[in-house]
């Protein structure tokens, strides 16, 4: 869909994903999508209930992050071309931000306000959201906010559990069309942050 719609995507994968789906990563790179780091082992950096605490040391954080970049380098993804880091679970604190910056990277995160990130949920989960509900949350947010979705980073998962038969990515073409009708231009992370 992204190729057909000429939309640049930004993909953040773990080292394990790069190992298992190297051919997909190569194809995404060949198609000029951004490929970035999402950690090697998808570690939880801070407790859910005490965000100001840490579950990792600086050394373990950096070792894990560097391992992710090594897997990327094995696929021809140059670190200089991948300066953005999306933390696992999109959960981090000030220490993680500082350590990321000290490593010469920019920590980014999805923009909160929609349910796009719930596209991984399955019907047996208490936080399950249908694809229709997710799509509507995005369009409602756009209509209700003064700045709409300008500068917004929507987080979608490239794949989901087979138990989720209602795949949100099947609604992607519709979402792209609707956003374009509303006057949006979908751009790369680099372009977004250059214009910021």
Task: Please tell me what each predicted stretch does.
Residues 65-66, 131-136, 168-173:
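Well-ordered, non-membrane alpha-helical segments in soluble/globular domains
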Residues 5-9, 19-20, 162-196:
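C-terminal domain-boundary segment and adjacent tail
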Residues 3-129, 147-160:
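Metal-dependent polysaccharide deacetylase catalytic core of the NodB/CE4 family, i.e.
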Residues 70, 142-146, 185:
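Compositionally biased, intrinsically disordered low-complexity regions enriched in proline and serine
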Residues 131-147:
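A short, acidic, amphipathic alpha-helical segment used as a generic capping/interface helix at domain edges
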């Amino acid at each position: 869909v992204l190729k057909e719609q000429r939309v640049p995507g930004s993909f953040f994968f773990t080292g394990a994903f790069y190992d298992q789906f190297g051919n997909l990563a190569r194809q995404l790179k060949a198609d000029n999508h951004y490929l970035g780091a999402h950690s090697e082992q998808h570690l939880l950096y801070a407790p859910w209930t005490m965000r100001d605490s840490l579950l990792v040391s600086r050394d373990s954080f950096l070792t894990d992050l560097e391992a992710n970049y090594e897997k990327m380098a094995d696929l021809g993804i140059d670190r200089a071309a991948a300066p953005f880091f999306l933390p696992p679970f999109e959960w981090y604190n000030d220490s993680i931000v500082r350590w990321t910056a000290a490593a010469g990277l920019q920590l980014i995160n999805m923009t909160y306000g929609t349910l796009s990130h719930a596209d991984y949920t399955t019907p047996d989960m208490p936080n399950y959201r249908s694809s229709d509900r997710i799509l509507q949350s995005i369009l409602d947010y756009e209509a209700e906010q003064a700045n709409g979705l300008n500068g917004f980073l929507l987080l979608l998962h490239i794949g989901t559990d087979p138990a989720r038969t209602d795949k949100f990515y099947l609604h992607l073409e519709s979402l792209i069309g609707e956003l374009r009708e509303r006057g949006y231009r979908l751009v790369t992370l680099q372009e977004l942050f250059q214009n910021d």
